[in-house]
Swiss-Prot record:
Crosslink (Glycyl lysine isopeptide (Lys-Gly) (interchain with G-Cter in SUMO2)) position: 63, 144
Keyword Iron assigned: no
Subunit structure, interactors included: Interacts with GPN1. Interacts with RPA1 and RPA2; the interaction is direct and associates XPA with the RPA complex. Interacts (via N-terminus) with CEP164 upon UV irradiation. Interacts with HERC2.
UniProt binding sites for Zn(2+): 104, 107, 125, 128
Name of the gene: Xpa
Residues carrying Phosphoserine: 195
Name of the protein this chain belongs to: DNA repair protein complementing XP-A cells homolog
Chain intervals for the UniProt region annotation (Disordered): 1-22
Originating organism: Mus musculus
Protein's UniProt keywords contain Transcription: no
């Protein structure tokens, strides 16, 4: 029989029904699934915050039937019986918004929307738009040839010029056209060349170089043509000429003469 001291010092046996401690990873996974289930429930409640009210209006009490829901995360939720109080919803009027008007740089009047403002960020109203000259749309090729601009001047120099993309009207299979605003292209050309006089001088120099290149090509073609003519004449001279005589003529004393029909050479001979 054990004494009282032995009973006090002996370790107590572990209860059989005490649950074992779960690893940290498992507990974290369980917690994530539980949070996911709660979020699904909150989202479902937020989707129907105001149940259908009674036809007579006013405050009503609605009781939802319990329902078993599988959250696909390891938990099955049972909807609790909830009471939703339905009342009249009062919407507060929104704040008064002031329109952001833009001032036209041509006439000085305010406007809300315009073609040039939307497509080219140019503060000009539709009434002041000069589509035939100042605000004319020109192609990228025309901008490069007329104002001596490069691709980097149009697309990479800050700020890059805005453009419109349209189908080529001449051929549907050709590439799309880039249309720039003439006013902005002129300003960019002045930024690149410094002044209108410098731009005109550069255009004259380029025109002179173009004329020189054309003259060189023309002289080269004339030289090749002369060489071809000389070679053909030289070939004709190297071939032997064969006379083609016409009918003979009786002169006198058994003397006869024949004349070449090609070169006019006369051959006189005597028949024995």
């Amino acid at each position: 029989m054990a004494t009282a001291e032995e009973k006090q010092t002996s370790p107590e046996p572990v209860a059989a029904d005490e649950p074992a401690q779960l690893p940290a990873a498992v507990r974290a996974s369980v917690e994530r699934k539980r949070q996911r289930a709660l979020m699904l429930r909150q989202a479902r409640l937020a989707a129907r915050p105001y149940p259908a009210a009674a036809a007579t209006g006013g405050v009503a009490s609605v009781k939802a039937a319990p329902k078993m829901i599988d959250t696909k995360g390891g938990f099955i939720l049972e909807e609790e019986e909830e009471k939703h109080e339905i009342g009249n919803i009062v919407h507060e009027p929104g704040p008064v918004m002031e329109f952001d008007y833009t001032i036209c740089e041509e006439c000085g009047k305010e406007f809300m929307d315009s073609y040039l403002m939307n497509h080219f960020d140019l503060p000009t109203c539709d009434s002041c738009r000069d589509a035939d000259d100042k605000h004319k749309l020109i192609t990228k090729t025309e901008a490069k040839q007329e104002y001596l601009l490069k691709d980097c001047d149009l697309e990479k120099r800050e700020p890059a010029l805005r453009f419109l993309v349209k189908k080529n009207p001449r051929h549907s299979q050709w590439g799309d056209m880039k249309l720039y605003l003439k006013l902005q292209v002129v300003k960019r050309a002045l930024e690149v060349w410094g002044s209108q006089e410098a731009l005109e001088d550069a255009k004259e120099v380029r025109q002179e170089n173009r004329e020189k290149m054309k003259q060189k090509k023309f002289d080269k073609k004339v030289k090749e043509l002369r060489r071809a003519i000389r070679s053909s004449v030289w070939k004709r001279e190297t071939t032997t000429h064969q006379h083609k005589y016409g009918p003979e003529e009786n002169l006198e004393d058994d003397m006869y003469r024949k004349t070449c029909t090609l070169c006019g050479h006369e051959l006189t001979y005597e028949k024995m």
